[in-house]
Each structure stands twice: as structure tokens, then as C-alpha cells.
């Protein structure tokens, strides 16, 4: 999921012309006048960037998100996992996997678990 999907568009373009661009609005992409550097040129481009496989999966949670978080261990590495209490993805330093609740990156965790994308 592209972090630009959560960026709001602005009305002030500093004398640049506004054009119709597409922005994520909930579970779809809608057109709105914006600066040329914002949003996406087409609805398809917006959907491909903002939704897994072009579809909204925000209400679905991958089963690995519900597993046990990693545990601390001496020979471990930084592991990203889903924290079901805070409903966010976190990184635990010097940890070892203790189940399926491990992800290659924070973005992968956020997409799989429906956690908010920050940025």
C-alpha cells in the first residue's frame, strides 16, 4: 500500500493550474480538483496503488495477524509484527519469530492486518 494514499490534497497550488486527480476516499478512489503533483492521474492507478490487487482489503485481517508476537532472543533480529492491543504494526528489536505473526516490513504488516498507514 502506497503511503501517498493517505495524503490529503490541498486547494492551494501556488499559482499552478489545478487538474482532476484521484484520491483514496474510504474504500474507493474519487476524482477531485488538485495540484498536478498530488493524487493519481486515473482511478485505476489510484486503486492499484492504494488497495491490494486493486481491491480494498481493509476490513479483512490475515490469520497471521492474530498469532503470537515474536519473542526477545540473543541472536535475534528486528522483526515487524501486528500488536492486536494497539491495532498497529510494531518492530521488536533483537527478536525471534514465535509463530506466524512476523512480516518483512511495516507496510506488509499494515496491508495484511488493516493497520493504519502512517507517513
From Swiss-Prot:
Disulfide bonds: 5-50, 13-35, 29-46, 65-113, 73-96, 89-109
Span of domain BPTI/Kunitz inhibitor: 1-53, 61-116
Tissues in which the UniProt entry reports expression: Expressed in salivary glands.
Cellular component GO terms held in the UniProt record: extracellular region; transport vesicle
Highest taxon of source: Eukaryota
Protein location: Cytoplasmic vesicle, Secretory vesicle; Secreted
GO molecular function: serine-type endopeptidase inhibitor activity; toxin activity
Gene3D superfamilies listed in its UniProt record: Pancreatic trypsin inhibitor Kunitz domain
Region (Linker): 54-60
Keyword annotations of the record: Blood coagulation cascade inhibiting toxin, Cytoplasmic vesicle, Disulfide bond, Hemostasis impairing toxin, Protease inhibitor, Repeat, Secreted, Serine protease inhibitor, Toxin
InterPro entries linked: Kunitz_BPTI_sf (IPR036880)
UniProt remark on domains: Has two domains of the BPTI family. The N-terminal domain bind to the active site of thrombin, the C-terminal domain binds at the fibrinogen recognition exosite.
Function of the molecule: Tick salivary thrombin inhibitor that plays an important part in the anti-hemostatic strategy of ticks. Is a potent and highly selective thrombin inhibitor (Ki=10 pM).
Protein name, entry field: Ornithodorin
Originating organism: Ornithodoros moubata
Source species taxonomy: Eukaryota, Metazoa, Ecdysozoa, Arthropoda, Chelicerata
Amino acid at each position: 500500500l502506497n503511503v501517498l494514499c493517505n495524503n490529503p490534497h490541498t486547494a492551494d497550488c501556488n499559482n499552478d493550474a489545478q487538474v482532476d486527480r484521484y484520491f483514496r476516499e474510504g474504500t474507493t478512489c474519487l476524482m477531485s480538483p488538485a495540484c498536478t503533483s498530488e493524487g493519481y492521474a486515473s482511478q485505476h492507478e489510484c486503486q492499484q496503488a492504494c488497495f491490494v490487487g486493486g481491491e480494498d482489503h481493509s476490513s479483512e485481517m490475515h490469520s497471521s495477524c492474530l498469532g503470537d508476537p515474536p519473542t526477545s532472543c540473543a541472536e535475534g533480529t528486528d522483526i515487524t509484527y501486528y500488536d492486536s492491543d494497539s491495532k498497529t504494526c510494531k518492530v521488536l528489536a533483537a527478536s525471534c519469530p514465535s509463530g506466524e505473526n512476523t512480516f518483512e516490513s511495516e507496510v506488509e504488516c499494515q496491508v495484511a492486518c488493516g493497520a493504519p498507514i502512517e507517513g
